[in-house]
Structure formats: structure tokens, C-alpha cells
Amino acid sequence: MAKKALVNKANRKPKFAVRAYTRCQRCGRPHAVYRKFGLCRVCLRDMAHKGELPGVHKSSW
């Protein structure tokens, strides 16, 4: 319940613009969020492995 409240709080427009921060759209994690995808590193990796993100694949060399 606390996480939902924090997600709702992050979605509101803050009084000052510098107080705004990004959260993962999938799980609500506040750290390590990629702006391009709107996902945290954990969800990004998970979705990339499942093939749910078009154009993203694991590189190997």
C-alpha cells in the first residue's frame, strides 16, 4: 500500500519542478530508471530477455 501511495505522489505535479522524479512504470521502483523506456534496469532486463521490447536484444561478443 505504501508503494502505491508513493507512485501516486510521484505522478502528481510537484510544487517545484526540481522535486519531480521518475519511477518505473511497471513496478514503481524509484532508482535506475531509463527515461527512454520509463522502466527500471530490472524490468528492462526482464522484458528484453522475454522479447517484449522491440529492437532490444542482449549483445554478446
UniProtKB/Swiss-Prot annotation:
Binds 1 zinc ion per subunit. Signal peptide: none annotated. Its cofactor is Zn(2+). GO terms for biological process: translation. GO terms for molecular function: rRNA binding; structural constituent of ribosome; zinc ion binding. Coiled coil: none annotated. The keyword rRNA processing does not apply. The keyword Thylakoid does not apply. Part of the 30S ribosomal subunit. Contacts proteins S3 and S10. PANTHER family: 30S RIBOSOMAL PROTEIN S14, SMALL RIBOSOMAL SUBUNIT PROTEIN US14M. HAMAP family: Ribosomal_uS14_2_B. Binds 16S rRNA, required for the assembly of 30S particles and may also be responsible for determining the conformation of the 16S rRNA at the A site. This is Small ribosomal subunit protein uS14B. The lineage of its organism: Bacteria, Bacillati, Actinomycetota, Actinomycetes, Mycobacteriales. The gene is rpsZ.
